[in-house]
Amino acid sequence: MRGAQVYRWQIPMDAGVVLRDRRLKTRDGLFVHLQQDDRQGWGEISPLPGFSLESLAEAEAALLAWVNAWRIGESPALPAIPSAAFGISCALAELDGTLPEAADYRAAPLCSGDPDELFESLAAMPGEKIAKVKVGLYEAVRDGMVVNLLLEAIPDLRLRLDANRAWTPLKAQQFAKYVNPDYRDRIAFLEEPCKSRDDSRAFAQETGIAIAWDESLREAGFEFVAEPGVTALVIKPTLTGSLDKVREQVAAAHALGLTAVISSSIESSLGLTQLARIAAWLTPQTIPGLDTLNLMQSQLVRRWPGNPLPYLDIEALEPLL
């Protein structure tokens, strides 16, 4: 016997969350819950505004169509919509035991630029000291000074930086000018510094600062090839599609000798715990980029271990079936 339910949810965000020049006041999404005999599986479908090509309404329509076919015994193909394909494939992988329970709950802490704050979070971090800094939101010179300060203050720190294509080549050079050349090899990578891949490649060549592809992975014509200066691929499953597609991208990165980083699209605690399991399974040597839960004001259905945010269970969700 098969059973299924789809739930709608909304979580208030912290006041300061801005994505692509728009303030994100709430995080809205869907859960799918599948049951077959004595097994069950959950998945999250939460397109990220400004980043996902699909709207939540489009994802919901695709999800409901799939669920209604599945629960009457059919084997429908996964929707083409990435967030729906990812969430459904996670629920199916829990249902059939494909998704291992073991999880990597280490998270590269998101740093606002305050070294004291970062010292504290890194002190509790076992092994490699890795943190992430968003750049491109303020002046490039300020970003360069902050990054330089952090690398100077914490000698065993490696930084992941994310510019979200915010910089012109000139701005990118202004940033690099303020980062001591002796520290640049401790920048693990800088995600997509410039609007075009060619400008980003030139930046890497000119500065010696390694770069990573993120948005590029989802563009038509992107090819998985080894390139000078490119050290990593940042894979956001909610924006990518099914678990199979995520596995293919990780395998392609590893085949080229690149680091593959499983990264958050600001999912709920349920989605983040699944991403932690996917990271432990597919990228066990790499700390995932999942430090986004504290941008939200509560956890849903599954807790992130050790996180003090309030927890809401299924009763807080809106069933759609």
Swiss-Prot record:
SMART domains: MR_MLE. Mg(2+) binds at D162, E191, D214. It catalyses: (1R,6R)-6-hydroxy-2-succinyl-cyclohexa-2,4-diene-1-carboxylate = 2-succinylbenzoate + H2O. Its cofactor is a divalent metal cation. It holds the Pfam family MR_MLE_C. One of its GO terms (molecular function) is O-succinylbenzoate synthase activity. GO terms for biological process: menaquinone biosynthetic process. Transmembrane segments: none annotated. The active site is at K134, K236. The keyword Magnesium applies. Pathway: Quinol/quinone metabolism; 1,4-dihydroxy-2-naphthoate biosynthesis; 1,4-dihydroxy-2-naphthoate from chorismate: step 4/7; Quinol/quinone metabolism; menaquinone biosynthesis. Gene3D superfamilies: Enolase-like C-terminal domain, Enolase-like, N-terminal domain. The keyword Chloroplast does not apply. Keywords: Lyase, Magnesium, Menaquinone biosynthesis, Metal-binding. It is an enzyme of class 4 (lyase). Its EC number is 4.2.1.113. Converts 2-succinyl-6-hydroxy-2,4-cyclohexadiene-1-carboxylate (SHCHC) to 2-succinylbenzoate (OSB). Belongs to the mandelate racemase/muconate lactonizing enzyme family. MenC type 1 subfamily. This is o-succinylbenzoate synthase.
